[in-house]
Amino acid sequence: LMVRDFNPNGSISALEPELTQVAEKTGRVLLAPTLAEILSQHGHEYMAIGAGTSGNAYLQNPTAEKFGGATIHPEFTLPRSLNQKLTDRFGAWPDESRPNTQRTAHCLRILTEYMLSERTPTVSMIWSSEPDKSQHDSPVGSSLSHAAISEADGRFGDLMDWLRRTGREGDIDVMGASDHGYSTISQTIDVEGMVG
């Protein structure tokens, strides 16, 4: 990631804590208001949880300390004061694995038992790290790739089952989306080398 106001001569990782450092130095990390900021202006809350990369999670609600809501991730939580409360209640995050079964289950547990049951934000987001994490390491069509897709489908099914069991399916709209797909490639491109 190139942020000239932060580092005029080099790239940085698009991860947390680097993005926090960008926000601290430049005053912001995004050029447009977040969904959390817009909702907060109308008395509503946005909460996000995910086990993907820390940068993707951070960008969901980087201003939770100011505008409310939360971003919950294995490596950090915003607002930072929420982290210990969640650890005390739900335990430490499981180690990352392929497929990322235990972390995805941990996300779902926090989503259903805390976010949707107690905080009841107007908008909630769960970012599944699968099949993305596994497909970075294993080709499309591999057994790991299929296991990761099955894992993602299973956790989505668990969420839908929870909504039915708790009688919430009529008052919560669920949308699914993917940020990208995968295909077989013959080589990678050294982007940093090209711009460095």
Task: Give a label for each model feature.
Residues 57-58, 69, 185-186, 193-194:
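Short helix/loop capping segments that flank catalytic or ligand/cofactor-binding pockets
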Residues 137-153:
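Active-site-proximal segments of metal-dependent phosphoesterases and phosphodiesterases across multiple
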Residues 1-139:
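His/Asp/Glu-rich, glycine-adjacent segments
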Residues 35, 107-111, 148, 152-159:
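Alpha-helical packing segments of well-folded alpha/beta enzyme cores
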Residues 39, 87, 163, 195-196:
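Hydrophobic alpha-helix position signal
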Residues 151-193:
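Metal-dependent active-site segment of extracytoplasmic phospho-/sulfohydrolases and closely related
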Residues 83-87, 146, 192-195:
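Generic detector of well-ordered alpha-helical segments enriched in charged/polar residues
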